[in-house]
Design a protein with these regions (language model features):
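Structural beta-sheet core signal
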Residues: 90, 190-191, 283
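Cap/insert and terminal regions of metallo-dependent hydrolase folds
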Residues: 198-313
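Core dinuclear metal-dependent hydrolase active-site scaffold
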Residues: 25-85, 143-229, 312-320
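Flexible, active-site-proximal loop/turn residues at the rims of small-molecule/cofactor binding pockets
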Residues: 12, 96, 119, 242, ...
Length: 320
């Protein structure tokens, strides 16, 4: 199934809310929000061959931000890029094959690739080899330390640690998977996959640990330079690989729907997640539990304030 065959009607471009499609877009200036296109919303295990056989099949998880920046990319997701779109930058969460594919990175035409500094050498070698094989220009591959920020295409990216593992070791250094805080003006979006919950250090790096308040921030800042002052998130995209199971053996490296729901509620109740009225948190990286399920059926079983992403969905996230 190609992007041209992928029809979503009026819901294809909606506000990131649980209201009627397009309502928030009409009431807000889209230039102030972060536009997200889900190129893929599935976990590992979905067979690309299924794309031609039936609907509701998910490509490996990947997003396109503001039509210019990618987070993760694999060959099946290339077909979901809008017609004529040539992304400029690619941020990688980790090196698992359902997220990182050097051939896809080179074919996409991006000029820069960011990875965590722990595996930058391996990433450079892989991307360079793919470019040579394809006889195409090789993107520049840059290592990014946790809590350090870079600005690309009008968006600010901060890498923070994910609770995940690849077991990749390069020159004695263990790879550290990443999540990303994406900021545009006052809008703050957390893209969290793959991860089992939000690690404490990540929460402190993006200012959402409720232990830290305006009153005691100075004390925490002295103990660790990576600690950010308290600041609420505007939007959340988080993985729910384990579906509605809280006993899945992957619980140590992946999240469930309940994990995401608890995360959203705790952040909301502590003032660390303040979306606009009607704006939902989205789950992605869905496992085979949801094979053959349309997103509407998944949404019907999700807690209030949450929705399931699907391939080709476009939403615009705003600050509250």
């Amino acid at each position: 199934m190609t992007r041209r065959e992928f029809a979503f009607g009026a819901a294809a471009l909606a506000s990131a809310g649980c209201m009627s499609a397009g309502l928030e877009v009409k009431e807000r200036n889209a230039a102030d929000g972060i536009k997200v296109r889900f190129l893929g919303s599935g976990a590992a295990g979905w067979d690309p061959k299924w794309l031609k056989e039936k609907p509701n099949i998910r490509r490996p998880s990947s997003v396109l931000l503001d039509g210019r920046v990618l987070i993760d990319l694999t060959p099946p997701a290339l077909d979901m890029l809008p017609e004529g779109c040539v992304p400029e930058v690619l941020f990688q969460t980790h090196s698992h094959g359902d997220h990182f594919n050097p051939v896809a990175a080179v074919k996409s035409g991006v000029k820069k690739v960011y990875v965590h500094e722990s595996w930058v050498v391996a990433a450079r070698e892989a991307v360079s080899a793919a470019a040579k094989k394809l006889s195409l220009p090789s993107p520049e591959v840059t290592g990014l330390a946790f809590a350090k920020s870079v600005e690309e295409c009008g968006l600010k990216f901060t890498g923070v640690p994910a609770n995940h593992s690849t077991s990749r070791v390069t020159d004695g250094v263990l790879e550290c998977p990443s999540m990303y805080l994406v900021e545009k003006g006052v809008t703050r979006l957390l893209y969290a996959t793959d991860t089992a919950g939000i690690p404490a250090d990540a929460a402190r790096m993006i200012g959402v640990d409720a232990h830290i308040t305006a009153g005691n921030y100075a004390k925490y800042a002295k103990s660790g330079s990576f600690v950010a002052p308290p600041k609420a998130l505007s939007a959340i995209i988080m993985e729910a690989t384990n579906g509605d199971s809280d006993t899945d053996f992957r619980m140590f490296v992946h999240s469930s729907v309940q994990d995401v729901a608890r995360t959203v509620e705790v952040l909301r109740s502590t003032g660390r997640y303040l979306p606009p009225s009607g704006q939902c948190a989205y789950i992605t990286h869905l496992g085979l539990k949801y094979r053959d399920w349309p997103s509407g059926r998944i949404d019907a079983e999700l807690p209030a304030g949450m929705r399931a992403a699907y391939d080709g969905l476009e939403v615009v996230f705003f600050n509250g």
